[in-house]
């Protein structure tokens, strides 16, 4: 019983992490170029 509960919690954490990463990447894509340069050096 305890093992399955732990597995569910781990799965939820994994999904939450994955969703958060996806959200951050989407936000970066939506952000203005000036904000983007903080994360990536400007390409010429």
UniProtKB/Swiss-Prot annotation:
Has keyword Signal? yes
Where on the tree of life does the source sit, at the highest rank?
Answer: Bacteria
Where does the signal sequence lie? Answer: 1-16
Keyword vocabulary terms for this entry: Signal
Q: What is this protein called?
A: Uncharacterized protein HP_0135
